[in-house]
From Swiss-Prot:
Hydrolyzes diadenosine 5',5'''-P1,P4-tetraphosphate to yield ADP. The keyword Amino-acid biosynthesis does not apply. This is Bis(5'-nucleosyl)-tetraphosphatase, symmetrical. It catalyses: P(1),P(4)-bis(5'-adenosyl) tetraphosphate + H2O = 2 ADP + 2 H(+). The gene is apaH. Its EC number is 3.6.1.41. It comes from Buchnera aphidicola subsp. Acyrthosiphon pisum (strain 5A). GO terms for molecular function: bis(5'-nucleosyl)-tetraphosphatase (symmetrical) activity. The keyword Cell inner membrane does not apply.
Amino acid sequence: MSTYFISDIHGCYEEFRILLEKSSFNDKKDYLWIAGDLVSRGPDSLKVVKYLYSLKDRVQIVLGNHDINLIAVHAGIKDNKKENYFDEFLSSPDSVELINWLRCQSFLKVDEKRKIIMSHAGISPQWDINIAKVCALEIEDRLSHKNYALFLKEIYHNNIDFWRLDLNQLDRLRYSMNSFTRMRYCYPDGRLNMFCKKSPDFVKYPLRPWFLMPSSISKVYSIFFGHWSSLKGTHVPKPFFPLDAGCCWGEELVMLRWEDGKWFSQAYLSKKCI
């Protein structure tokens, strides 16, 4: 029994299945942890989600910003843009069932026995592990609720970038969503920056990668995340494991087997990715 970590599949189904074959992933005994962004940009979002849905308890997923966008588009809250490649998914007779399944996925996975954490963008350096767990549960509860569309209408907000215990309920949810699905850099005071996507090699003070900020969590846990394809080729210190290698941008899909630390990769094949 092995555990594999991967992220940012982005609808690149063919590359994903080849990578699973290369790694000898066994869907009857192995586990797959995915750090979000299953969909969008690549041509086969529907195939990716249907396959993961079929794995049942063999897959552990945290949602990324593109997964949230798909749910919002399906609910009629956001426009379906051409570059999403959502048409096949939205017209599928299985779309409602699959969307409801996605809505019930997590924003944070924690394995206390192995001291592993997974989220899409990362973990706010302003949080300790207990606050992170509570904040994840709060947005998971809202997204899985029957009135999730109202939640999604209110959750998008760029200015909620600093954590305080006295945040009102809505701003607390907004901050949590921004932290789990959007952040890359922080300012020295801990404020999030959700807009700069460049490699740290080309970014100067005052911006600093979130994983280089002081944090009590990184002293205890190995942290797996995606969301940041421009980190490829940049030194990221342990205990952080970036998983987004930019497959949908013409690069590659990568996967780590936890037990022996072996990495697997598959170069981009699809010609419809943007």
